[in-house]
């Protein structure tokens, strides 16, 4: 799939810079392979609502972030999760765990904009799940707020909707929230959310 031309932090760039970079990568794809890919992977997994629209307008059908999770039929095609498997995160024990991981299906995650200005950091996070998820009250969520991974406080608004209390700002380039739910058979359901911290606040 396409991963941009420069592999720079495009999410912080002007629209014209993003479009020029993607257009160049598509020209190279077409020149060497005779066609363009339907798949796009955001550089560093970073995207904004604006970046998503650009990718849609270029005709890509699927786009991947870098938030962990399992793809299922309910996921936004332009915010697909992926587990990194590489020289740092590629041990066979971890791989065996990942292939047995199940999706944690949700209707909506708020805020929809994952590109955070300083005034929106920390974000007010709300997750609305589908009605048929068993034992949802046993879910656990963790975040790297304040640049330190910790167990996050969650509060249920109703049986299917919860808030994740992020009390400290995300520090650095990315903020992450991971939620997991253990099934009776020992399998885990997993949901990851990634926020991008705006370069200029």
Enumerate the predicted regions with their spans.
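Terminal accessory/targeting
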Residues: 85-201
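Histidine- and/or cysteine-centered catalytic micro-motif in compact active-site loops
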Residues: 5, 68, 130
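Repeat-unit-sized solenoid/scaffold elements
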Residues: 30-33, 37-43, 69-74, 149-166
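Intrinsically disordered, low-complexity regions enriched in small/polar residues
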Residues: 42-44, 49, 64-66, 144, ...
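Active-site-adjacent pocket scaffolds in enzyme catalytic domains
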Residues: 1, 52-115
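Sparse, context-dependent recognition of short Cys/His-centered cofactor- or disulfide-binding micro-motifs
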Residues: 25, 63-65, 164
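Long, contiguous hydrophobic alpha-helical segments, chiefly transmembrane helices and signal peptides
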Residues: 40-43, 63-65, 85, 125-127
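Metal-dependent polysaccharide deacetylase catalytic core of the NodB/CE4 family, i.e.
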Residues: 1-51, 61, 74-81
